[in-house]
């Protein structure tokens, strides 16, 4: 299966990043937000879009998971070792 270079979900543009054969993910950056314990968290609407992207990619037969890192980044990581 060939992956789309960019995917827009709920108005958020996720960019495909292919660093290595085992390091492939979609990423999108929102505002830096903080929870009640002052830990960084993704924007709620961006996180919902990431979860929807997970659902889309799973329906396409991929094994994926969503995560977030610092500075507002959200990633949807693709497990490329699943028969592709």
Report each predicted region and the residues it spans.
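Short intrinsically disordered terminal tails
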Residues: 1-3, 80-84
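An N-terminal amphipathic alpha-helical segment
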Residues: 1-29
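Residue-level signature for short turns and capping positions that connect secondary-structure elements
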Residues: 14, 31-33, 81
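Short amphipathic beta-strand/extended segments with alternating polar/hydrophobic composition
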Residues: 15-18, 45, 77-79
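Acidic, low-complexity, intrinsically disordered interaction modules
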Residues: 20-73
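C-terminal edge-of-domain segments
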Residues: 72-82
């Amino acid at each position: 299966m060939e992956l789309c270079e960019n995917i827009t979900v709920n108005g958020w543009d996720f960019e495909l990043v292919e660093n290595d054969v085992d390091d492939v993910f979609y990423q999108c950056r929102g505002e830096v937000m903080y929870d009640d314990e002052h830990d960084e968290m993704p924007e709620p609407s961006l996180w919902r879009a990431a979860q929807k992207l997970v659902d889309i990619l799973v329906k396409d037969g991929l094994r994926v998971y969503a995560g977030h890192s610092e500075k507002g980044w959200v990633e949807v990581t693709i497990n490329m070792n699943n028969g592709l």
